[in-house]
């Protein structure tokens, strides 16, 4: 919001005037502030611009990456918590995995095979999210590939819902909407293309 900068500008110029700034100096300051304001507006415009391929604005990309950055240092725990909640809510999904079939969830979440699988999945998601700031076609390709990889397993979008739940307080409503608008859409597109 440019109004914060504009209020700062007025306040600083008043202070400088009270402390001896002359008319020529004030004109120079105003010229400098005009240039700063122009670049701030350009930067804000680029954050609001929507990428035609992903459908995400720069603000939405930043919201997703900020949230992910809060949990990125503990990806294994994010994966284990997400899959644990997913399997608790949808036991039939657990049965899709040969190594997980017939294992009680309480034991499964302590299993090295479970930890390895969740680490692979969340690492793939991590790489995909980091591609948000790369060329959009690469991001779209990665998301569609994730969707295609899971169609044969009968996977749906439930994983994303439980991922949001696992991220907890680090996810605000804006970020949830940003995830929902693009990630789920591209995963579903990948699933449809299979």
Curated annotation (Swiss-Prot):
Key word Metal-binding present: yes
NAD is among the record's keywords: no
Keywords linked to the UniProt accession: Heme, Iron, Metal-binding, Oxygen transport, Transport
CDD domains: Mb-like (cd01040)
Pfam families recorded: Globin (PF00042)
SUPFAM superfamilies reported in the protein's UniProt record: Globin-like
Disulphide bonds in the chain: none
Binding residues annotated for heme b, in chain numbering: 150
InterPro entries: Globin, Globin-like_sf, Globin/Proto, Mb-like_M
Gene Ontology molecular function terms on file: heme binding; metal ion binding; oxygen binding; oxygen carrier activity
Globin domain segment(s): 1-45, 55-194
Membership in a protein family: Belongs to the globin family.
Subunit-level organization: Artemia hemoglobin is a dimer of two similar sized subunits. Each subunit represents a globin chain which exists in two forms (alpha and beta), thus making possible three different phenotypes (HB1, alpha(2), HB2, alpha/beta, HB3, beta(2)). The globin chain is a polymer of eight heme-binding covalently linked domains.
Record protein name field: Extracellular globin-E1
Source organism phylogeny: Eukaryota, Metazoa, Ecdysozoa, Arthropoda, Crustacea
